[in-house]
């Protein structure tokens, strides 16, 4: 379970960084 928790925290960290950059910069992909 330790490895699962580590992967979960790492994924959440990457997601936070991704959303921070995505919302900081203007959206380039328009649908």
From Swiss-Prot:
SUPFAM superfamilies: Photosystem II reaction center protein T, PsbT (SSF161029). Keywords: Membrane, Photosynthesis, Photosystem II, Thylakoid, Transmembrane, Transmembrane helix. It is found in: Cellular thylakoid membrane. One of its GO terms (cellular component) is photosystem II reaction center. The keyword Thylakoid applies. GO terms for biological process: photosynthesis. It comes from the Bacteria. Its main location: membrane. It is a single-pass membrane protein. The chain crosses the membrane at residues 3-23. Coiled coil: none annotated. Found at the monomer-monomer interface of the photosystem II (PS II) dimer, plays a role in assembly and dimerization of PSII. PSII is a light-driven water plastoquinone oxidoreductase, using light energy to abstract electrons from H(2)O, generating a proton gradient subsequently used for ATP formation. PSII is composed of 1 copy each of membrane proteins PsbA, PsbB, PsbC, PsbD, PsbE, PsbF, PsbH, PsbI, PsbJ, PsbK, PsbL, PsbM, PsbT, PsbX, PsbY, PsbZ, Psb30/Ycf12, peripheral proteins PsbO, CyanoQ (PsbQ), PsbU, PsbV and a large number of cofactors. It forms dimeric complexes. Belongs to the PsbT family. This is Photosystem II reaction center protein T. It comes from Rippkaea orientalis (strain PCC 8801 / RF-1) (Cyanothece sp. (strain PCC 8801)).
